[in-house]
């Protein structure tokens, strides 16, 4: 990553975010700018989309790292924003893509993510979750045209994230 590239971290929604989780610590050690969901207990899709658009527009180039609900945000944003060309790549960890009909009622401002190939290279790193099964995460990876390494233990997740971070040229061999 060059000096003109910004790493943007889109964490999970506040109910499920774990500030001490290794993924969050990893993003912070890489100098990531946090673009977090502010609404609690109901995450607001529109508010977070505006924050992401502003963050991307303020950077000449950026990489996105998203976890859980943040992955749905990236997909929704890429479907409408013309700023996607500033994104070098995206790392999507354990995607969770609810819609307004989600049984919890917490996602009433969210719409179903439009199944489409993302306009930038991406990796989906699977993460076991009661909200999003691995098979569903693999389906999102295929839909988005993302590299899918298969199920990984936590050590494998960290290795995959480091590979994505350190070797952009290796990523392009997957696309």
Name every feature range the model reports, one short phrase each.
Residues 2, 55-60, 84, 168-175:
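Glycine-rich phosphate-binding loop signature in dinucleotide/nucleotide-binding domains
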Residues 2-61:
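Active-site catalytic motif of lipid deacylating hydrolases and related acyltransferases
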Residues 63-66, 90:
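Conserved alpha/beta-hydrolase fold motif
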Residues 65-74:
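Gly/Ala-rich beta-loop-alpha elbow adjacent to hydrolase catalytic centers
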Residues 76-80:
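Active-site signature of alpha/beta-hydrolase-fold catalytic machinery across serine-
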Residues 84-100:
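A conserved short beta-strand
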Residues 98-145, 149:
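The feature captures the conserved acid-bearing segment of alpha/beta-hydrolase catalytic domains
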């Amino acid at each position: 990553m060059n000096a003109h590239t910004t790493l943007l971290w889109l964490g999970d929604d506040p109910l499920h975010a774990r500030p001490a989780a290794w993924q969050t610590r990893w993003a912070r050690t890489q100098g990531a700018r946090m673009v977090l969901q502010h609404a609690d207990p109901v995450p607001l899709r529109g508010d977070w989309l505006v924050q992401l658009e502003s963050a991307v527009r303020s950077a000449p180039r950026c990489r996105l790292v998203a976890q859980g609900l943040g992955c749905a945000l990236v997909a929704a944003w890429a479907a409408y924003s013309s700023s996607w060309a500033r994104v070098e790549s995206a790392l999507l960890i354990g995607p969770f893509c609810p819609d307004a009909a989600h049984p919890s009622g917490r996602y009433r401002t969210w719409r179903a993510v439009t199944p489409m190939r993302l306009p930038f290279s991406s990796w989906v790193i699977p993460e076991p979750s009661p909200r999003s099964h691995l098979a569903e995460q693999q389906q999102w990876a295929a839909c988005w045209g993302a590299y899918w390494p298969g199920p990984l233990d936590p050590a494998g997740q960290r290795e995959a994230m480091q590979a994505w971070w350190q070797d952009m040229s290796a990523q392009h061999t997957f696309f």
